[in-house]
UniProtKB/Swiss-Prot annotation:
Coiled-coil features, chain-numbered ranges: none
UniProt cross-references to PANTHER family, sorted A to Z: 3-DEHYDROQUINATE SYNTHASE, 3-DEHYDROQUINATE SYNTHASE, CHLOROPLASTIC
Protein name: 3-dehydroquinate synthase
Main location, first listed in the record: cytoplasm
Pfam family, one: DHQ_synthase
Cellular component annotations (GO), alphabetically ordered: cytoplasm
NCBIfam families for the chain: aroB
Span of the signal peptide: none
HAMAP family xref list: DHQ_synthase (MF_00110)
BP terms from Gene Ontology: amino acid biosynthetic process; aromatic amino acid family biosynthetic process; chorismate biosynthetic process
């Protein structure tokens, strides 16, 4: 068994995640091996920066295997994760003549992946798509699990669908082109997995020499943390594909993080930076409610900060915080649900948190 091939086992539409150095240079071969024939048109969706780095090489490789393929770039940045970008992809799909046998490839970070996935879910009522994530955050989180969406002015990811990719191909080499701020932001999601389900991963991340290797983009260390993160997510998604139960724990830090992203203006904080602050708030609430030890909370905060991530909450109007939280997808029957830690490697879902218990962190 190849330890860097991870199956996401679902009742329908199971698929493989392959992690391999250099895999981005052999996507044509990979597609043929999973049964995608070269009679299918392919539209690669990316952004200009990523396309300049990897697009031509990917396109040439696909053409080597006689695929008819083109690249279409959307604008980069969270503020462009919207219906306008979605429509641009639809227009490109129409111009290129994508039928129901066609394939979309998302080449880029989480924004490209989310928008492309939603385009695939909705173009001609659904066509296949592949994820080739190029950021750490998209590798360990958004490329796996089938959540696709665009933002609405009233909230993040409010317009979307659960729609699984046919495959995910991860090349750690692409991280060497990533700005260090974005790499560190991706580490927030890796730390999240340690807190919610994988104590061993958390302890691995705490060790100084491991942190040094990770931040220096050591290939073996990167593959290890990507692999462990995806295995945790795959397990959770396999138990609850549509987020009716346990999958909600993957949103640890996200309720407060989305508030910060929205109210500070998309782009002021990177997604992972906002999530790191959200985890800090959730940890503090848990400490106050005696759900976990103060020592655990301090360990979490120290780990977050050791990877260069923020923990200081920005000043935000309390009324606006409630407005955004009540529009959150995790609200059920008018009640806000929060993911709070009970120990390193264990969290639970709570709906009995009073407003006063979290609003004070936004003073």
């Amino acid at each position: 068994m190849n330890k860097n091939k991870i199956i996401v086992p679902l009742s329908n539409n199971s698929y493989e995640v392959t992690i391999r150095q250099g895999i981005i240079n052999s996507i044509g071969k990979e597609l043929t091996q999973i049964g995608i024939n070269n009679n299918r048109k392919i539209l690669i969706v990316s952004n200009k920066e990523i396309s300049n780095l990897f697009g031509s090489k990917l396109l040439n490789d696909l053409k080597k295997y006689n695929f008819s393929a083109e690249i279409f770039n959307i604008k980069a940045g969270e503020s462009y994760k919207n219906l306008a970008s979605l429509r641009e992809i639809y227009d490109a799909a129409f111009e290129f003549g994508l039928d129901r046998n066609a394939l979309l490839i998302a080449l880029g970070g989480g924004i490209v992946g989310d928008v492309t996935g939603f385009a695939a879910a909705t173009w001609l009522r659904g066509i296949d798509y592949i994820q080739i994530p190029t950021t750490l955050l998209s590798m360990v989180d958004s490329s796996v699990g089938g959540k696709t969406a665009v933002n609405h002015p009233k909230g993040k990811n409010l317009i979307g669908a659960f729609y699984q990719p046919k495959a995910v191909f991860i090349d750690p080499e692409t991280l060497k082109t990533l700005p260090i701020r974005e790499f560190k932001a991706g580490m927030a999601e890796v730390i999240k997995y340690g807190v919610i389900k994988d104590k061993e991963l958390f302890e691995y991340l705490e060790i100084d020499k491991n942190r040094e290797k990770i931040l220096n983009l050591d290939n073996e260390s990167l593959i290890k943390i990507i692999n462990k993160s995806i295995r945790t997510k795959s397990y959770i998604v396999s138990k609850d594909e549509k987020e009716n139960g346990i999958r909600a724990i993957l949103n640890y830090g996200h309720s407060f993080g989305h508030v910060i992203e929205n109210l500070c203006g998309y782009g002021e904080y990177l997604h992972g930076e906002a999530i790191s602050i959200g985890m800090k708030i959730a940890g503090d609430i848990s400490t106050e409610k005696n759900l976990w030890l103060k020592e655990d909370s301090l360990r979490q905060d120290k780990l977050i900060e050791s990877y260069g991530l923020p923990t200081q909450t920005p000043k935000i109007k309390k009324h606006d915080v409630i407005t955004i939280l009540m529009g959150d997808k995790k609200v059920r029957d008018g009640k806000m649900r929060f993911i709070l830690p009970k120990g390193i490697g264990e969290v639970d879902i709570f709906n009995d948190i009073k407003e006063s218990q979290f609003l004070k962190y936004f003073d």
